[in-house]
Regions:
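Residue-level detector of family-conserved "landmark" positions at structurally sensitive sites
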Residues: 49, 60-61, 231, 241, ...
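Redox cofactor-anchoring modules in respiratory/redox and cofactor-processing assemblies
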Residues: 1-213
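Cys/His-rich zinc-coordinating "finger/knuckle" motifs
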Residues: 134-140, 180, 228-234, 238, ...
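Ferredoxin-like iron-sulfur electron-transfer modules
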Residues: 118-121, 202-223, 234-254, 265-268
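Short cysteine clusters
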Residues: 43, 127-133, 173, 221-227, ...
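Functionally constrained cores in energy, signaling, and assembly domains
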Residues: 40, 44, 104, 143, ...
Length: 268
């Protein structure tokens, strides 16, 4: 404010673009080297912020997804990284400025997992007054759970999109209208990832543990028994007295406890 008073409004309005003048403070997070609150010219692009200001994606990995607008925001692929950070450009890309925050993630992130978090947060925050938001978000969350746990079907994608569009136009407040952005943009830009979860039942980011099918590599198992005690359902037999462990997938709940307990990488 002091700089504007000193230099004048014309100086401040010289920054930005035709859609929006001046600057904006953004909250930056995700798999970037430097995060925090930073102020930018409104004409600055995602790419410029990530590479020139935040030091790029950490650990020399590649950008996979930009989550713009916070929990009520949406997802953008790397091809949209040249989008300026002004209101109209973000709307044209299918997302919102929202809380003026964005997170940049590498390939270790799963779009379905991120969408589940956003929808789950918004479901918990709904006041419950309108049916689209109160019931609709629960239905969407259940569908996302099905996809991430191996029960999804390809027709679920069209159902999800239709339900999200219905909530978007019938919810009574801004929360309900934007609560489904993560799902809509996820299906639009990352449909192949949704289909891989459904058809191949594989999460390349290894975030959806419900898709795991655990197998013990007998040649690597030393029968130490370390995997038996952490298992909450007693799904593991053997593993002692020189007998390799065996996992009963009918009892397994995909909690990942055995995988984390094995120090010999015998469980895959």
């Amino acid at each position: 404010v002091s700089a504007i008073l000193k230099k004048g409004s014309s100086w401040y309005s010289s920054m930005g673009n035709d859609n929006a003048k001046g600057t904006k403070v953004w909250a930056l997070s995700g798999n970037i080297k430097y995060n925090g609150l930073m102020e930018f010219d409104m004409s600055t692009t995602f790419h410029e912020v990530i590479e020139d200001v935040c030091g790029g994606i950490s650990k020399k990995k590649e950008l996979k997804v930009i989550h713009a607008g916070g929990v009520t925001g949406g997802f953008l692929p790397p091809s949209k990284a040249d989008t300026p950070l002004d209101y109209e450009s973000l709307l044209d890309a299918g997302v919102l400025m929202g809380q003026a925050s964005f997170a940049a993630y590498d390939e270790s992130a799963c779009v379905i997992d991120l969408a589940k978090f956003s929808v789950g947060f918004n479901e918990a925050e709904t006041c419950g007054k309108c049916t689209p938001c109160r019931i609709g978000l629960t239905l969407i969350k259940n569908k996302l759970d099905d996809i991430s746990e191996g029960r999804g079907k390809l027709e679920d994608l069209d159902k999800l999109q239709s339900l999200c569009e219905e909530i978007n136009v019938t919810a009574l407040c801004g929360l309900g209208e934007t609560a489904v952005k993560a799902v809509l943009t996820g299906i639009k830009y990352f449909r192949a990832e949704y289909e891989r979860h459904i058809v191949d039942q594989i999460c390349d980011a290894a975030r959806c543990t419900g898709l795991y099918k655990y197998v013990v590599k007998e040649e690597d198992c030393v029968a130490c028994g370390a995997c038996i005690k952490p298992c909450p359902t007693g799904a593991i037999t053997g593993g002692t007295r020189k007998v390799a462990a065996h996992i009963d997938m009918d009892l397994c709940i995909n909690c990942n406890a055995c995988y984390e307990a094995c120090g010999f990488l015998a469980i895959v």
